[in-house]
């Protein structure tokens, strides 16, 4: 059907599906550098592709619509200035050195937390799909049942965790 696959990997830095890094599975992979992400520069993002035609188009769109082969004042496409600044690039380069190490640490911590709370009635964690060979653990997801805590609302439960120094917030 000639359908393009665009991966939303905004929160999946260093994650892998069946041993293949996310962002390299589809025609385009998109990642975010927003401040809350595992790899961050305050804002921004990047796109990955192995398709040279798409790479040229993306380059043009992020570079004011310029053509990679044309003069700097030629703008065959309508684009914007989405180029990464030097300061942001420096922040990201320094983080890339430890990306895999930090991903492994998040994975160990995610497993340890899951194991530690698995017997608490009213708290259920999601079981990662076995095809996820490297989990990004951008967030740790759990389901809360107020019934198991005498009707304590989710918001009060979150408030209590935070009061004890355990960072917690509601999902999307």
Language-model-derived ranges and their functions:
Residues 16, 52-172:
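PLP-dependent aminotransferase class I/II
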